[in-house]
Structure formats: C-alpha cells, structure tokens
Amino acid sequence: MLVTAYLAFVGLLASCLGLELSRCRAKPPGRACSNPSFLRFQLDFYQVYFLALAADWLQAPYLYKLYQHYYFLEGQIAILYVCGLASTVLFGLVASSLVDWLGRKNSCVLFSLTYSLCCLTKLSQDYFVLLVGRALGGLSTALLFSAFEAWYIHEHVERHDFPAEWIPATFARAAFWNHVLAVVAGVAAEAVASWIGLGPVAPFVAAIPLLALAGALALRNWGENYDRQRAFSRTCAGGLRCLLSDRRVLLLGTIQALFESVIFIFVFLWTPVLDPHGAPLGIIFSSFMAASLLGSSLYRIATSKRYHLQPMHLLSLAVLIVVFSLFMLTFSTSPGQESPVESFIAFLLIELACGLYFPSMSFLRRKVIPETEQAGVLNWFRVPLHSLACLGLLVLHDSDRKTGTRNMFSICSAVMVMALLAVVGLFTVVRHDAELRVPSPTEEPYAPEL
C-alpha cells in the first residue's frame, strides 16, 4: 500500500502538471493580468486567503487518525463528525447575515481566532472538549466560505471600481492554487506527523501559526466593509419560493444534496478503510487532491472550444463515476476479502469525479438560480445535504464494525443511483435550454464546499 500510494501520487502530479503547462501555453494573457493595481489588490487578498486555506487543508489528513490515537471507538468518532456537520449547517444558515453584521474583515479575523481555538482543542483527550472543538470548526468553516469571498467582491467593485468581469479570473486562479495548497498540505502533514514522528496532533498545531498570520495580515492590510442585511426569514422564504416554482432548481438541489452527502460520508470512511493497511495518510490525501485537480483540468479542457462539451454532460459523467466507484467499494471492503489497492483506486475516481462535479454544479447553479435568491436557495440545499450525511454516520455508528463500512458504501451506492435518476430528470428538462450551454471557451472557478 505504501509503494502504491507514492506511485499514484507521482503519476497524478505529473499528469496535472502536463495538463496545466499545455493549458498555460495555449491561453492568451488577459487585460486584467497586466493591470498593476489589480494585481496588487489580488495579492493582498491571496496572502490572507491562501494562508487560511492552507491551515484548513493541513488538518484534513489526520483528523480521524487523531481520534483513533486517543482510543475513541468508531461510533464515538462518528458522533464527533456528526457534531461538526451539524454545526456547519447551523452556522451556515446564518453565516451571510453574521458576516454582514460583524463586517467582512472582522469576520475573517474571527475565523482565524475560532479556528485556532479549534486546533488547540485537539491537544485535549477529553471528549467534551473535542465536541466543542468540532462546533468551533463548523463555525470556522461557515466563515471561511462566506466572509473572504464577500470581502473580496465588495472591495473589487465598490472600493477599487474594477470591472465585475474580472472577478471570475480571481476565483479561477484561487481555485487552482487551492488545489495546489491541498496537495502540498497533505505532504506537509505527512512530514510533521510521520516522517519527523511528532504524531497525528502535529498538523493541527502547525496550522495555528498560519491562522495567526492570516488574521494579522487581514488586520493590517484590509479595509472593513459591511452590507445591508436582509432578514433571514425573508432570505429563506424567497429561496423556498424559487425552489418550488422552478423544477430545474428543485432537481439541481436534489442532485447536490445527494451527491455531496455521499462525499461527506466518504471523507469519514477513507481513513478507517486504508489506514489498517499501512497507508501514508498525508500522501493518500495529497493523491486525492491531485486527482481532484486532474478532474478540474479535464473539465476546462472538455468545455474548451476544441471539445465543447457542456457542464450538464460532465455533471452526468461525474455522477456515473461515483456510482461505479461505490459499487467497487462494496466489494473491496467485504469482511475477510478487503482489497486496499482497489479501494484506493475507487477513492481516486471519486475525487476525480469531484473535480468534474464542482465546476459543473457551480456553472449550472449560477445560470438556474437568480442571484438575489442564491443565498436562500443554498440554505435549503444545505439542510437535506448535511442531514443525509449525519443520518449516514449515525447508521454507521449503530452497525457492526466488520460489516458497517461495506453496508455504508452499499447505502451510498443506492443514494447515488437516486442522484443519477435526478440527473436524467434534469437533463430531460434542460436539454433544449440554450441558457445552460457554454457558448465559448470558459474558465469556471472551482470552489470546494466540503
């Protein structure tokens, strides 16, 4: 398993590098890329945002392993994950209103503080302290995926008066470097935890200086901005009306809830499936992120002028790949007949599918959901998404360890078949909808929501 992990990592990294180099040679420079003021503004944003992302990714490979290291049972670990998911959905519902009320810069600084506290709780072996840490992690995640983007968009348009058409360029570049940071973070986590031998808590301690630096740079370099608050009840009511009045929105929300709930369960299960076979968790995680980056690169190539595939086609392909991968996992995790290499390949295919799924979903969501109602509609998407994931983890918590993992993958397979049926329904509804087609080469940003 050790050799397989390193070979896969090197191979995926080489593939990604080759695709990105060919894309960069073929892509003409844009006007925004040569504007010195815009580049300075981008740099001020990236310095803080990339530090925050790096700190987040650094913790991912060893979270489950840390709880195992503290001798918690799988059911207890499942409850910790459920607590994190529940806090994410609760804080996510009010994150936009909270950010508007506190101010975007203040919210980014608050993120640095709460996430640092979350990391500090990992030093404790007390179960209640770890539950509090998971709740803080949920708040931090909600702030990470709302405050930073809101601050940038307001500053870009209102303070600097740059063209709104340049905003996607910033987030497309951020999406690429987010993947790169995730790959590097996995290797760094492996280095401090395993190579140096500091143990599974080391990546969490290493994340704290990055978070402190991100908060300090935001305080020093960023201006504050606020926005007019819209009542939370009005936001949700408007989102519900949009959801019920447009079948496309309802089907898209169903696909998102089913697909991403399965991905949340995958995040929980990959460590207990591979770790008993001596897998280097940091390198495994970096391989996952490289596979996702490869999928994102393939999305850009597929939607280019040369191939001109549509996001709807790639969304269908992503769901099909995950269905196939989950069927593989139901066999590779059979008690007494485990095949870790086959499971690893299936996990890589799931991550590749994520690289196709997220930019496709992002494109379709922006086209289908009115901009004024996106926050409200997304709130309604999050509730079933996280509820399904929590339910799945609780089912695993109550099952026998030897058969529970395989049963969970079987359930996930059934869920993804339902998602595939929803994709077929959406495809039937939108097949003649020109609005959902890419008319020219596009560079859709990938914004990971897990």
From Swiss-Prot:
One GO location term (cellular component): membrane
Write out the transmembrane intervals: 1-21, 43-63, 79-99, 128-148, 174-194, 195-215, 249-269, 278-298, 311-331, 344-364, 376-396, 409-429
State one Pfam family annotation: MFS_5
Keyword Ribosomal protein (UniProt)? no
InterPro entries documented for this protein: MFS_trans_sf (IPR036259), MOT2/MFSD5 (IPR008509)
Task: Indicate how the chain sits in the lipid bilayer.
Answer: Multi-pass membrane protein
**Organism for this UniProt entry:** Homo sapiens
Its biological purpose? Mediates high-affinity intracellular uptake of the rare oligo-element molybdenum.
Per the record, the GO terms for biological process are: molybdate ion transport; monoatomic ion transport
Q: A single GO molecular function, which one?
A: molybdate ion transmembrane transporter activity
Query: Which body tissues produce this protein?
Result: Expressed ubiquitously but at relatively higher levels in the olfactory bulb and the skeletal muscle.
Name the UniProt record assigns to this protein: Molybdate-anion transporter
Q: Where in the cell is it found?
A: Cell membrane
Protein family according to the UniProt entry: Belongs to the major facilitator superfamily.
- Keywords, in A-Z order: Cell membrane, Ion transport, Membrane, Transmembrane, Transmembrane helix, Transport
Task: List the top taxonomic levels of the source.
Answer: Eukaryota, Metazoa, Chordata, Craniata, Vertebrata
Coiled coil start-end: none
